[in-house]
């Protein structure tokens, strides 16, 4: 296998046994693909596919005026260029977006002509607002902050059949219902009531009998009965009644008389129940008619109206119950044929017939009116209004759309074969749904499982943005329609008709404040990736936390390979917010698909198919770990498989598919937990959630025990710098990498230079630090896709969230009681868990009513000492160390409380005494913060003079840009001259540049000429002269292009900033705060084993082994058995082996062993103990030495999820490292030197420091703000609040009889306003007495009682 630049430097020993059939797909594809589809940015107008923006425009246009004399058609759209790049947008606090220009055509028809002749056509491009662009990492920059649009898992449009699980009626009877859910439009529900009549609801309003809807559709009672029922035909002749016999229909009935065959033999005796055997005999005997007594027909329902043969009078309407009187009447009239409905209690209930009986309407108009009354109660119905309303409900494409998905699901559910069709409902659709519902009630067919992933689909960014855009366009449409009628008379252009504000507002609202547009979690690369791959059931059109029951949240069999069963938040959102599985993707309909290998007749092929939950149901799917031989045949007699959403076993020849990888079940975060298969699910959930909260440490340290997914996450997250094209590193420093691109990757006419500017010490959304460090050195050769620089939490291109710590599992002096963690001081000294946090503090100078605020170093009543870190503009220097309360930006605000007399005004004007009329409103460092100023940004409004600091910053930025462009030019020029040198060498000169005719060009000759003179050479060959001219022209063009680029950037920098109204200047100061680990910080492993640091002990007191090596962390062994996360123990053992092997390699290098010996030892590590074979033969000796040097701190191992290291392999590794195979060793107490009485598990575990730091939570209050009504101190750190002294705490003091302490708590320390002021004064005077008064809460109580209308007063004696 080929190794990338970074992989070669440090290979992970991989324990996986199963082959890699398929690489993990690009992890951010779900976001990027969806939005690319929405914008279709590169497409020309004939290439537009009917999706995204294009589809939204087509669904609203053409807009036709009310009179029909003018129409506005849509032609196409184009996207402009963004004004700023992503970094500039973040800095300036603006949205990263492009202008959208739509080409529309206004057509005006001739009123006079009868055939709508076209009178005038105008085409014009109209600006339709800005559309946010997605960055290459799948985020949006909205108002300067990075946001992610989370995908939504919602109920797919279509038709669903369900029952109430017996909860509605006290009898526990199942009431069935059907619901047609469109993509947009009214919902249509059919439901049974306890009396078995069918009702319909539109948009969950009051219910009507379902027959009302059928009548409104134009069906008569007879047509309805014909559609839903078959009939029994009776012949009447005199007193005799005979039935046309269909034997099957008699099954289960009790014979009312003896039934004979043709020969008079009795087949069924009277009073016996008719069984299948009897029916067979009847069919054999060929009985076609059966004489029945008259009572047999009583109580049956007529299927057609019964008409008097002579007079034509209707004796009985259809759907009438036959009674004795009616039968007499019919017999008198000599009717010979009666048709009745065939119903029974088993599989053909009389539900529709009963519904028709309770229906009060009798024709279509009455039904329409009834529906109108239900939808618009209180409005007088007219025929037209009722018809229009009904048609608009389900049959108008403007108001109703099932969408392609909905139509496909609808047709499949009601048993049609075609999957395409109209977006609106038809009569047949509604009847088919009712038929299916009645069938289910009759016991044919089953209800749907709403939590099945075949019934829930994912709405991604693109689709949601399209919906919002359509909403905006519909708002525009109304306004355009009204203006269109004026278009002709006033000669308006399309520009005048369309107001883009509603569209822009709808888009802005969606990206800025939708529930699914979220502030991106940016603690570390994993939290970014997970956030982008999140799937939420909440949000507009989704569920709400309160209403979501247990079933929706639970893991469903169809989640397998689509949604992770482990990763979901704890708390109220559990199960509603999920994560995509590692290999999952969405199909064209938005259903989640998982990949499978195709299996034919027990042989596994390498073909891969992606299947949705519906398609997979009928397949027999083997596990990825199913045993195979070399010919890829399944060899077990019975293979463990999934079939029909159940786990079972089948013979190999029955298997049709096989999983591609064991980790396809879990999400990215869960697949980063080694030995996940040995952890309890609850703890694995915590483990995957806590990895997202890890803070990037100062020096990232790769996990010794990983899973092999680390590299994928680091690469796909976008925090590393990945080579866009291969080439040679031309120059590299801390802030940029310049690559001279390989010739075969340079397209003609473009520069063969890639410049990568690294991000240095930038603030993330969570205030952690984003910093990139180069991995390459000058002259290195890199290929496309190689990682050239590490980002936060990455180490040599691998995700590195924490640090490898030497841990011991032992109880130790109670310091690790209840999940506490005991740390060694060495961890602090080596800065293992030191993190950098960057805080952005902003100072805004506004224009106030009393005059403008000013940013200045001239602040009233502030000593020199406080100003020594400010420059002359009043802004702090970069590099200054500042603490709480220090001034960062000096700002004064005019104050105008005092009214000045005219005399005073005059004196002010003459002597300019300014200090008294401004107040100090400087930006100061908040309490509890100290750090270093690492950057300052100044933004000035257009037209306001820029201060010296702003100009200095601008100059610095311009120098950076110029440096980049010059570098690019230098390399382009160098490459051009290199090519010329190769072409000219050994050629003959014709003159020019001071050379004689006939001179042969050599390197020396060329070195003697300046570059400018090369172009003056006239060569003997014309082709060479042409090449020289082209090269000269190319260099001139390139220079001009770069100069234009520079001017463009300069213009952007020098134009004023677009600030909010009333803001003159904004200064942003960035503070870097260094936080060491300290007691109170939260730490965790990757297995949900979390704890708080309780104590940091001196190194010499920590337990140590026989060699004197102390442990770094002591964990409590009691935290393991009850929580069942044994993975941490296995990780500890394997970590010990990894470290031991590293130390062994280190000793070999120190002893200066030969490369061959190292190669042998490395081969033993990588290729002799289980897992994947590494190809070390292709490495040169230098590469082997480089590899060995990178392994000195430990050989990193990968134990993939569900396919990891076995116990025997861990033991073999420990043995190879010359360590005890038990993984336990004898420890000594550092304080006494005594042995502990039994050996202790010691090893290396990967520990994370979580973003729950004691510094952010700890807080102390002296005096501060008070609540307005109760006059009690506020609560919480943000409000600088006090400590709550609640009811139970009062009881505690009462119990101790501490009366004076209690009095103090309830009065002067709380809400006794006068008492606390007095006390403050007393303390200032050195007098520590207190005089409690009346607490304010007493006055509040009195006011509350008075508000009840009771007059109450406090009487004082």
Swiss-Prot record:
Keyword Cell cycle among UniProt keywords: no
Catalytic activity: RNA(n) + a ribonucleoside 5'-triphosphate = RNA(n+1) + diphosphate
GO MF annotations, alphabetized: DNA binding; DNA-directed RNA polymerase activity; ribonucleoside binding
Cell inner membrane in keyword set: no
GO cellular component, as recorded: DNA-directed RNA polymerase complex
PROSITE patterns in the record: RNA_POL_BETA
Keyword annotations of the record: DNA-directed RNA polymerase, Nucleotidyltransferase, Transcription, Transferase
BP terms from Gene Ontology: DNA-templated transcription
Entry EC number(s): 2.7.7.6
Role: DNA-dependent RNA polymerase catalyzes the transcription of DNA into RNA using the four ribonucleoside triphosphates as substrates.
Protein name: DNA-directed RNA polymerase subunit beta
Species for this entry: Pseudomonas entomophila (strain L48)
